Amino acid sequence: VMDPRWLDATEMAAWHAFVSTFHLLERRIEEQLKAAAGLTHPQYEILVRLSAATDHRMRMTELARDVVASKSALTYQITQLEKAGLVERAHCPSDERGVLAVLTDAGMRCLERVAPGHVEVVRAYLIDRLSREELHTMTTAMRKTERALRSSH
């Protein structure tokens, strides 16, 4: 059995900064979305993805991959959004077993109402606090990590 490669001081500082910042930012985002529209962050991300998709619709499997959710977690979120009238399900014309999530007009209006406040929070606590160079470095580092995580599944 190999000994674990413990984190040195620099690595530990980076890890702790990432974890605490992620949780604090996520909390601010959740507070803003809940106050503005009663949405959770995952629900908001679903609305964003659907708004950008052709005809405001996506296959559930593709949507789960995009929002990094398990199929059961996505199904739960879609059910909540459906109850709120923001999303509906439709059968996939090219695959009878496939299910599409479709953004409703009410869902689009909700997104248009909530998005400015969401961007404000993201800017205030992350984007506007970093230089362009820091943003590029962060993007490069996070994409490397994301690729490793996605390819290990």
What are these regions (language model features)?
Residues 1-9, 132-153:
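C-terminal regulatory/oligomerization modules of transcriptional regulators
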Residues 25, 29, 67, 110, ...:
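Alpha-helical linker/hinge and terminal dimerization helices associated
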Residues 19, 48-55, 115, 143:
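Short, locally clustered residues in the helix-turn-helix/winged-helix DNA-binding domain
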Residues 60, 78-79:
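Short, hydrophobic-biased segments on the C-terminal half of alpha helices
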Residues 1-37, 84, 136:
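N-terminal leader segment of winged-helix/HTH proteins
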Residues 23, 27-70:
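N-terminal helix-turn-helix DNA-binding core of bacterial DNA-binding proteins
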Residues 79-137:
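Charged, amphipathic alpha-helical coiled-coil/dimerization segments
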